[in-house]
Amino acid sequence: MTVPRYAWGRVLFLAIVTIVINTVPAGSAEKPTFYMIAPSLTDPFWVTEQNGAKQAGQDFGVNVVFQAPAQDTGDAGMVPLLQAAIAAKPAGIAIDYTSKTLEAVTTAALDAGIAVVLYNNDRFEGENAPADKRIRDLAFVGQNESISGEILTRAWLPTLQSGPCKVLIVNPFPTAFVLTLRADGVKRALDAAKYPHSDLAATGDEGQNLSLISAALQADKGICGIVGLGNPAANPAAQYVGDNSLKIPVATFDVGAEAAKRLKDGTLTMAINQQPFLQAYFAVANLANQAKYSLKPVNVNTGTSIVTTDNIDVIQKCIAAGRC
């Protein structure tokens, strides 16, 4: 491994803080090796991503190394892992492109002749717009947040009462642009159906959000539906609706274990699942097909799986198997 100046320190750092999910077995030197760099492994979402990468490695007969910082250090924590991955000269790298912080290292990978695909995030908006046009052209595997917001809302609208009533959109992380994109899609669908809506800035704390949602519903009796832009918003909304026997449909993005339980008991009406297992799986599939057959990586939208009480039993089995 060739890393400028502080090589041994970085190698030691990687040995301590990264997780290798598919070590290179003896006699497999002819197999292409791919790196998948993630921001975290402390969230079940990323464990599921890891499972998808591992399965793809087995199915396509390639070596996959899945790495993440030991602590949630955001974009910056992925940079040294990507630099070390480039130095290892793999056949390809899958990058969760969360911001412009990752532009220089992504460009470095492309300059080194390494195949790159993006997964989970391809944040190119505003100040994140990459100067390197090659990055914009990279294949992306993941959920189109804005389109998913529109698809979810259109599917959910028939559960609302007819006539004029308001939808409350609860954002647990107001500074996260990804949730702004989700909200944009939700609002487009609501506007098209002529449903007024209001925004509620919440937090990542479900206990605090329960109080905020309770206050909002008590202050505005015209609210007939709630969209939580993430589980920290939707779970307490569903709890409040259930505890007070209200007939207010609640929709959300992503399906964690708690959200699955609430879909099962009916207090949560609908969710859209971005399918993290498939994000990682198809990212590796793209790289494997390019390395083996020179097939150009393609975009894959994984985020259009609607979950309701009708199919929650299957989804719960999928969650238990580490595939949802």
Where are these regions (language model features)?
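Beta-alpha junction/loop-to-helix N-cap segments that form part of ligand/metal-binding clefts
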Residues: D72-N128, N231-A234
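Hydrophobic alpha-helical
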Residues: I95-A112, V186, S198, A202-R262
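Extracytoplasmic "Venus flytrap"
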Residues: T33-F60, V65-L82, I95-K100, N171-L181, ...
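Short beta-strand elements in bilobed, periplasmic/extracellular small-molecule ligand-binding domains
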Residues: Q58-Q71, K166-I169, K187-G207
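Hydrophobic alpha-helical segments within soluble ligand-binding/sensing domains
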Residues: M78, A139-K166, N209-L210, V255-A259, ...
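Flexible loop/hinge segments that line or gate small-molecule binding clefts
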Residues: V105-I147, G256-K264, T269, A320
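Hinge/cleft segment of the Venus flytrap/periplasmic-binding protein
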Residues: E30, V170, L278-C324
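Short, solvent-exposed amphipathic alpha-helices that sit
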Residues: F45-F60, S148-L152, F177-P196, L212, ...
